[in-house]
Regions:
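Short, well-ordered beta-to-alpha junction loops that form the rim of enzyme active sites
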Residues: 118-121
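Post-Walker A helix-loop "phosphate-sensing" segment adjacent to the P-loop in P-loop NTPases
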Residues: 22-29
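Extreme N-terminal starter segment of soluble prokaryotic enzymes
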Residues: 1-3
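Small-molecule kinase domains that catalyze NTP-dependent phosphoryl transfer to phosphate-bearing small molecules
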Residues: 6-9, 98, 102-103, 123-130, ...
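Walker A/P-loop
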Residues: 14
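Hydrophobic anchor at the beta1->P-loop junction of P-loop NTPases
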Residues: 5, 116
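ATP-dependent small-molecule kinase phosphotransfer cores
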Residues: 33-112
Length: 169
């Protein structure tokens, strides 16, 4: 069984996936795993930092990598920016829109029960359904910051240099 979990930021997608892994022996698969492996190797970033869910790893992903920022001439080049830019702006837009979906599909075919907790795009949902999977939408009471975050990128884009359109709430 394949279960794709989607929902807004902070809704509990990983909590649902962790439960399925712990209690029902599901294998966790991520659309972003191959991208994170690639960026960790290319830029010399710690793989655990790219994957980590701790507050510390979230903060580290936002810190500008001065070495790469200077060498590439890209101000504000942080791990988060690098992941988004390479993942979406380069690979999805200029190589193949389904590159991460295809890479993940190849992985999930090896297992019987799989949970994917980072479902964000329609092509990801389509692949899950095409392989007989289900999409679970995690819906809980929206946090107090939700409405502010929903409109913030349109109101003050200059203050959000690391937010890519795929990350808007």
């Amino acid at each position: 069984m394949i279960i794709g979990v989607c929902g807004f930021i902070g809704s509990g997608k990983n909590t649902v996936a962790d439960y399925l892994v712990r209690e029902h022996c599901f294998v966790p698969v991520s659309f972003a795993s191959v991208l994170k492996d690639t960026c960790a190797s290319l830029f010399g970033w710690d793989r655990e930092m790219l994957e980590g869910r701790s507050e510390e790893s979230r903060i580290q992903r936002e810190i500008i990598d001065e070495f790469w920022s200077e060498r590439l001439g890209i101000p504000n080049f942080s791990p988060r920016y690098g992941l988004q830019y390479i993942g979406t702006d380069i690979m999805r837009k200029h190589f193949h829109p389904d590159i991460w979906v295809i890479a993940s599909e190849r992985v999930l075919m090896r297992y019987r029960d799989v949970v994917i907790s980072d479902v964000r795009f329609p092509n990801e949902m389509a692949m899950i359904r095409r392989n007989g999977g289900k999409i679970w939408m995690v819906d809980r009471e929206r946090p107090s910051w939700y409405d502010v975050a929903l409109n913030a990128p349109e109101q003050m884009p200059e203050f959000y240099p690391h937010i890519h359109e795929s990350e808007y709430v």
